[in-house]
């Protein structure tokens, strides 16, 4: 069985209890797939507090590859795979530029998105968003 959470985890409260529930719902060979924004990405670092994927107050939690791996481990999961979502950087960068009310937000966002995409090619853990595949510990 599989549970998928596409840009959901950052909205959930209470977080620890949710992870415990997810673990209890999965069978021994169950898989949890979660996609979340990566606050250690190139675009997050470039924009700082203005990064649109912080999305306060809707995003209650912000994850790095290390923090989500530790969270999963704390609740009985092993990180099996990690995949970048490099194209999220284009949308997030354009939205950030728009929210900052800067001139030419589309063009500026595309430039930053392109730079972020190249950074993610070299260092996948710097992708704007990441997909994590967790398996239950045995």
Q: What are these language model-derived features?
A:
Residues 1-47, 60-75, 87, 129-137:
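Conserved SAM-binding loop
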Residues 4, 50-54, 112, 116:
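Generic, low-specificity signal for short hydrophobic/alpha-helical stretches with a mild N-terminal bias
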Residues 6, 33-34, 52, 102-108:
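N-terminal start-of-chain detector that recognizes signal peptides
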Residues 36, 49-57, 121-123:
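Generic structural signal for short, flexible, solvent-exposed coil/loop and linker residues
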Residues 47-56, 95-102:
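Short glycine/proline- and charge-enriched loop/turn segments
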Residues 78:
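Residue-level detector of anion-binding/catalytic polar loops
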Residues 81-138:
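A C-terminal cap/extension of S-adenosyl-L-methionine-dependent methyltransferases
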């Amino acid at each position: 069985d599989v549970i998928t959470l596409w840009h959901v985890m950052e909205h959930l409260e209470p977080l620890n209890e949710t992870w415990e529930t997810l673990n209890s719902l999965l069978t021994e060979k169950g898989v949890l797939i979660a996609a979340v924004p990566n606050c250690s990405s190139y675009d997050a670092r470039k924009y700082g507090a203005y990064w649109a994927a912080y999305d306060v107050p809707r995003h209650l939690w912000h994850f790095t590859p290390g923090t989500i791996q530790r969270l999963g481990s704390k609740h009985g999961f092993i990180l099996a795979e990690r995949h970048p979502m490099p194209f999220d950087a284009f949308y997030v960068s354009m939205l950030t530029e728009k929210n900052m009310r800067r001139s030419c937000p589309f063009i500026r966002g595309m430039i930053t998105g392109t730079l972020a995409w190249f950074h993610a090619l070299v260092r996948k853990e710097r992708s704007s968003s990441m997909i994590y595949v967790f398996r239950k510990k045995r």
